[in-house]
Design a protein with these regions (language model features):
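A positional/architectural concept
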Residues: 45-47
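A cytosolic small-molecule/anion-sensing beta-strand core signal
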Residues: 30
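Acidic/histidine-enriched, glycine/proline-rich intrinsically disordered or flexible terminal extensions
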Residues: 148-165
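Acidic, metal-coordinating catalytic segment for phosphate/diphosphate chemistry
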Residues: 2-25
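Catalytic phosphate/metal-binding cores of nucleic-acid and nucleotide-processing enzymes, i.e., regions
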Residues: 84
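Unchanged
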Residues: 55-78, 87-142, 161-165
Length: 165
């Protein structure tokens, strides 16, 4: 894709697009609150997000979602529901396909790890200003029970363009 001059989502031929990585994000919503994390390292370090990460070669997206929540928060999400997929292209040629899950319950006690700090927020007080710029576009839809989907173009952590499905 080597096109550092991408400025619009329409500069990308999505029919040929193949992500560098595949990943998951999981949002646990219980009793009017959402469990988020402050990411300590990796892509999005310092930002607030849902727990998640890259798929390993031998696992499904569901297995990845469970593993990542277990690794980042020392809990096990229960009854995960797939909510949709998000496609991210960065101007430095990195790209990632993210499958988003939602869970209404979990086993264990959310615990800080070397990867993440657990944070609970009321669903109407989500700190979007501390999150990736795209989250405010699709997370409310997911919380309302809608399927989500979208394509996003970023330069570092700045969103240049997007298209929701």
């Amino acid at each position: 894709m080597k096109n550092l001059k991408m400025a619009s989502i329409h500069d990308i031929d999505w029919s040929l697009w193949r992500p560098v990585d595949r990943a998951t994000l999981t949002f646990i919503v219980k009793d009017g609150e959402i469990l988020l994390i402050r990411k300590k390292r990796g892509l999005g370090a310092g930002k607030i997000n849902g727990p998640g990460g890259r798929l390993e070669s031998d696992e499904t997206t569901l297995e990845c979602a469970i593993r990542e929540v277990q690794e980042e928060l020392i809990i096990t999400p229960l009854d995960l529901t797939e909510c949709g997929c998000l496609y991210f292209q960065f101007t430095d040629d990195y790209s990632i396909h993210v499958t988003v899950f939602r869970a209404a319950d979990f086993e264990g006690q959310p615990t800080e790890t070397d990867e993440a700090i657990p944070l609970w927020f009321k669903v109407d007080e989500i700190p979007y200003e501390e999150m990736w710029a795209d989250d405010i576009l699709w997370l409310p839809k997911m919380l309302a029970g809608e399927s989500i989907g979208g394509r996003f173009l970023f330069s570092d952590d700045r969103m240049l363009d997007y298209e929701l499905e």
